Every structure is written in C-alpha cells, then in structure tokens.
C-alpha cells in the first residue's frame, strides 16, 4: 500500500485500512467478474440514436428495454438496406417489453388488504435473461415499484422492504438483501436498477439500512453475513479518496479545504441516458453555453440522487439545463454515509473486530462534524446542501434536510429548529412538500413522496418531536386513503397541496403500484393506530395513539469554527 504524503498523515489516519483492503479485494474480483454488460446505446450504436430520435414509442424507456433478437452487430449491418423502414425493422429485430396487465383489486378491499394483495403482483424473478437483454439477472425474486418500472430499484427497495417486513414477508426481505449483495459482488456496487444502462451510477445508499432491517429478524447473524458487501459498497462510495488533495473531488468523494471528507452524487458516463435519450439531448441543446457532456453528467447524477429532477440541483428552478448536481454536496447522501459508517462499526463489532469498529466510529464522528459544519444553514435555521462553487451552504429548504434527524446525526437544538422549519414551510394538507418551489419538476412542490414522509416522521420522532411527526403521517395517510377510495390504487407520488390527488410533473406520466408508497403506508398505519386496535384503513378521525418510538438522547451542537 502506498504510504501517505508526509503532509497528510493525520487526515489519512481517519481512513480505515479496510478501505484500501476493499480496493484490493475489488481489483482481484474484477479479474474474476464477467465482462460488464454493455448498455443498449453502445451495443446498437447509431441505430439506437436513430430509433430514439424517431420517437417510435411514447416512452423512451421502451426501446432501452427492448431485447435484440440476434447479435446487435448483425442487426446493425442490416440497417438502411433497400426499402428500409425503421418501425418495421425494429418490430422484426427486437422483442419489445410487454405491457403489464392492469391489476383490478377485488371489490371491497381495505387499504391494508389491497397492499397485502399487491406484493405477489409486484414480485418478479429473473434468474436468467436473454444474452442481449438490458435486464440484469438476479438470483432471488424481488419486488418492483410498478408501472413503467419493470426492474428493481435501489433506494425504492428499502421502503418497499419496510412494508414487506410489516406484512410479515421476511423471506422476501431476505431475498432482496441477497440480490443487492449479489450485485455488489458482481459489479462492485449496487446500480440504480438492474439494467445495463444503470450500471454507471448507484442511488442513495440504503444497503446497510436494509441489512440492519433484516437483523431485526435474524439478529447479528445478518450483520456478520453481509459485512463484506457493506465494506465493498463503502469502498465504492469512497473510491479515489486515498489520492485526494484538499479542495479536490474524485467521482463520488469530496475533500474540502480543511480535509473534511464528504460525498456527492456521480455517474461515470457523460452521455444522454438511454431511457431518456431525446429529452436529455434537447436539454443539452437548450443551453449552448455549457458543454453537452457536462449537462449529461449532471442529469445522470441527478438520477443517481433519486431526485430527478428538482430545483435543488438548479441555478434557475425554471430551467433544467442549469442543473449542476456534481458541484453540490447533498445533506441526505452524507447522512446516509454517516449511517453506513455507524452500521459498519456495529457489524464489525458483531464480527469480533473491535479495532475495525473503532475505525468506522472515527469516520462517522468525523462525518457528523462535517455535516454540522458544512450542511447546516445557521442563518435560515435548517440543514441544506453545500455548494462547491460558491463555497457556501445553500439557502433552499428541502425535505432532504430531515435526513440528519433520520440517522440521528443532528444536534438536539438543531433538530428542534428543523421541526419548526418543517411545520412552517413544508407541511401541507396532504403531507410533506418536497420543496417549496414550483418548477414543474416532479421533485418539487406540490409533490410529496412516500420515502420523504417516512424519513421526516421517523427523524422527528427520534428527537421527541412527535406532534409534527404525527401531523406528517396523518396528512399523508389521508391523502393516500382519499386517492385509493376514488381510484382503487396507490401511486408513486401525491399532490400534497390537497388530498386525494396524485402528483404530476417530470418526464413520464404518474405511475401506480407502487412499492415504496405501499411500504410507507403500512408503516404509518401501524404508527397512528394503537397496537390493540390496528387499522386496515385510515380512520375518519385521527386516533389518540401513543407511538412506541422513543426519542434518542442527543447532544447539543458543538460550535463550528
């Protein structure tokens, strides 16, 4: 292992030896791993561009998911022959994804019965896939979100798994953890989803939390079993840190001037996304003052954040082409990295490696100080993202600000201020607003998303802010119930300015199903109703229940220099 430069020994000491060991393990593994599947835009070359630009399908994801019927090289050689017709050519040479059968729930089902009945409907098995398929095989069955999302998605799955656990389907939780561990072992990280075109990026890192969830059922055995994969994922997120100088960024790692290590979202490619090809090209063309590759990278990195798209990443909330995701240090990502470090410490201790546990604790403590120093806006009184270009914390309040509370990284006095800010600026009749900005993007007002409702609810409860937490749950559940009563389905996102309406905006129509909404709804139903009187629907009047969640003892914020 290369020795650190003499000017950096103290800072490098904060990085556990396991990171370097994991890098070595990954490099050895890379020699044994099959060639990484190529995404369709590379496999098909100019043909892919021609088909997407011709807009043969209403959704660009359709052709990205189409399976070539023979070697793509042979298919490409047949293009533009005499009498060539592009639509006919595609129909002959590709198998298009099948539209999912519309699920019609039995009459008279309660909300809980509907969700429990959906788990098998949303379950898929793909142990084997066609040779040229963009779908990546997984060894165990998994639950998909629903609608156009025919594959498993990384961060969606954690909130889906909360619901599976609530329904008693611990076998499915275990299967999905095993699948994600398989992806880490196979590709070195968990991709955005199990598609070849998602391999160049990940998503909010919830794998360690998934293992922690499974450990609620299986005990420390789960932590010990998946410790190697958690370490490998940590190595992926910290890749490049060993050579990073102060003030530099490398892939997903940021080193600030004082040596603080934080993370950002990143995609290894800088081309249009195959699943949104035409849209990305149009976005890049609309801003000739920026290199197209830079815009493509920032679009892809926003997809890696899960928030695609939001004013959070933009200089001008009304212009998507001003997004610059890679120059923003997100508060939610770094909260999740803190949690990953804490769980790695716990798992290392369970495995009997106290020295390694102490190293991860040291890393977590250093990151917590970084969050308090760089991701807190003292003037506004809330957590926010850090801007690498202006070298300042940003002013915008978003629902991501509640992640430090969710992972118990916030100081008590700051959590109290967050509760006030949440109630004043984000709480709406139908739940928690994603932001207070109306940009037309789906991760902005007036949309509310199930995972953010749960993060806020749990986070506020961790700090004894039960009233605001229960307000969020009650408002969101009412929204879900009213929509279900009218449409007999749960949807991907909701308009929280009212109740009973699905959300809008973004690149595609509103999707139903819907994995993470199902999971969060079950958790919230069991939160608001007393255990001795569980509810199958949201009650007409708010129950006077007491949560079993106890606030975690917190310390006051340390003054930042």
Swiss-Prot record:
Domain of life: Bacteria
GO biological process, one term: trehalose catabolic process
GO molecular function terms noted in the UniProt entry: alpha,alpha-trehalase activity
Enzyme class per UniProt: hydrolase
Positions of the catalytic residues: 308 (proton donor/acceptor), 492 (proton donor/acceptor)
EC number from the UniProt entry: 3.2.1.28
Subunit structure: Monomer.
Protein name: Putative periplasmic trehalase
Species whose genome carries this gene: Escherichia coli O157:H7
Gene name per UniProt: treA
């Amino acid at each position: 292992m290369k020795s650190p430069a003499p000017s950096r020994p103290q800072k490098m000491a904060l990085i556990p030896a396991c990171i370097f060991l994991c890098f070595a393990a990954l490099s050895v593994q890379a020699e044994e791993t099959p060639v990484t599947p190529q995404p369709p835009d590379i496999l098909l070359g100019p043909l892919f561009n021609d088909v997407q630009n011709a807009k043969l399908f209403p959704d660009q994801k359709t052709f990205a998911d189409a399976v070539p019927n023979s070697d793509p090289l042979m298919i490409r050689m047949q293009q533009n022959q005499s009498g060539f017709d592009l639509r006919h050519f595609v129909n002959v040479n590709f198998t298009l994804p099948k539209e999912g059968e519309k699920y019609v729930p039995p009459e008279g089902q309660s909300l809980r019965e509907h969700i429990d009945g959906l788990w098998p409907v949303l379950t898929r098995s793909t142990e084997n896939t066609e040779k040229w398929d963009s779908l990546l095989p997984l060894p165990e069955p998994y639950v998909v979100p629903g609608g156009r999302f025919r594959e498993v998605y990384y961060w969606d799955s954690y909130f889906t798994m909360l619901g599976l656990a609530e329904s008693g389907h611990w076998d499915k939780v275990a299967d999905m953890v095993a699948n994600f561990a398989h992806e880490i072992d196979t590709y070195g990280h968990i991709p955005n989803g199990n598609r070849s075109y998602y391999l160049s990026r990940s998503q909010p890192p919830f794998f360690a939390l998934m293992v922690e969830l499974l450990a609620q059922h299986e005990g420390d055995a789960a932590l010990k079993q998946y410790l190697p994969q958690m370490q490998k994922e940590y190595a992926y997120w910290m890749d490049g840190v060993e050579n990073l100088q102060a003030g530099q960024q490398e892939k997903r790692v940021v080193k600030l001037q004082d040596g603080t290590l934080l993370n950002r979202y990143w995609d290894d490619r800088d081309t249009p996304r195959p699943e949104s090809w035409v849209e990305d090209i149009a976005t890049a063309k609309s801003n000739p003052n920026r290199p197209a590759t830079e815009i493509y990278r920032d679009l892809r990195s926003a997809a890696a954040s899960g928030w695609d798209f939001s004013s959070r990443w933009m200089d001008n909330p009304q212009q998507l082409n001003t997004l610059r995701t890679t120059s923003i240090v997100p508060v939610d990502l770094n909260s999740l990295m803190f949690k990953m470090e804490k769980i790695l410490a716990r798992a290392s201790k369970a495995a009997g490696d106290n020295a390694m546990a102490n190293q991860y604790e040291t890393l977590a403590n250093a990151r917590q100080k970084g969050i308090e120093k760089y991701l807190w806006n003292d003037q506004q009184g809330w957590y926010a993202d850090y801007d690498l270009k202006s070298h300042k914390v940003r002013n915008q309040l978003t629902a991501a600000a509640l992640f430090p509370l969710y992972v118990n990284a916030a100081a008590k006095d700051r959590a109290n201020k967050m509760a006030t800010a949440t109630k004043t600026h984000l709480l709406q009749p139908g739940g928690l607003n994603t932001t207070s900005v109306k940009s037309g993007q789906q991760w902005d007002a007036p949309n509310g998303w199930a995972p953010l409702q749960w993060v806020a609810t749990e986070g506020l409860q961790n700090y004894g802010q039960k009233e605001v937490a229960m307000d969020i749950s009650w408002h969101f559940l009412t929204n879900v119930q009213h929509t279900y009563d009218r449409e007999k389905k749960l949807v991907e996102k909701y308009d929280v300015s009212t109740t009973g309406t699905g959300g809008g905006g973004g690149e595609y129509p509103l999707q139903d199903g819907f994995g993470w909404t199902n999971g969060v709804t079950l958790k919230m139903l069991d939160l608001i109703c007393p255990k001795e009187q569980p509810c199958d629907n949201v009650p007409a009047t708010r129950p006077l229940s007491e949560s079993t969640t106890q606030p975690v003892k917190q310390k006051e914020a340390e003054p930042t220099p």
